[in-house]
């Protein structure tokens, strides 16, 4: 079991953070979709990391998507982070800021 995190790299807090996560693809020749999970955080302080959810290693064979929406400086922002099938692998590790752990990161 691994954990997924959201990093607020901005110099100010972000608000009304909504994260939708899902996995999809093929496993053993069958099309697979995970349940869509939704997470809400009223506020995430600047230069902070928060744990979103655990992710099972068996799901690394799927494409894993995190769709993040938040309010910042009076505007709404929306971005999709996609870990394509097989990208969550030690070969793609980097040091994750603020927690000083190794993992896969998309900016």
Residue ranges and their predicted role:
Residues 53-107:
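Terminal connector regions
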Residues 27-61:
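Intrinsically disordered, low-complexity Pro/Gly/Ser/Thr-rich segments with frequent PxxP/GP/PP motifs
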Residues 1-8:
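Short beta-strand elements of extracellular/lumenal beta-sandwich folds
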Residues 9-14, 44-45, 72-76:
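A short, structured loop/turn motif at beta-sheet edges
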């Amino acid at each position: 079991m691994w954990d997924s995190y959201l990093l607020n790299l901005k110099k100010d807090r972000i608000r009304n953070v909504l994260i939708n996560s899902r996995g999809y693809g093929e496993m053993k020749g069958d099309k697979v979709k995970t349940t869509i999970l939704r997470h809400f955080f009223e506020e995430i302080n600047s230069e902070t990391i928060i744990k979103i959810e655990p992710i099972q290693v068996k799901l690394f064979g799927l494409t894993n998507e995190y769709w993040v929406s938040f309010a910042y400086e009076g505007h709404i922002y929306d971005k999709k982070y996609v870990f394509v099938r097989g990208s969550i692998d030690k070969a793609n590790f980097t040091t994750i800021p603020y927690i000083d752990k190794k993992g896969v990161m998309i900016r």
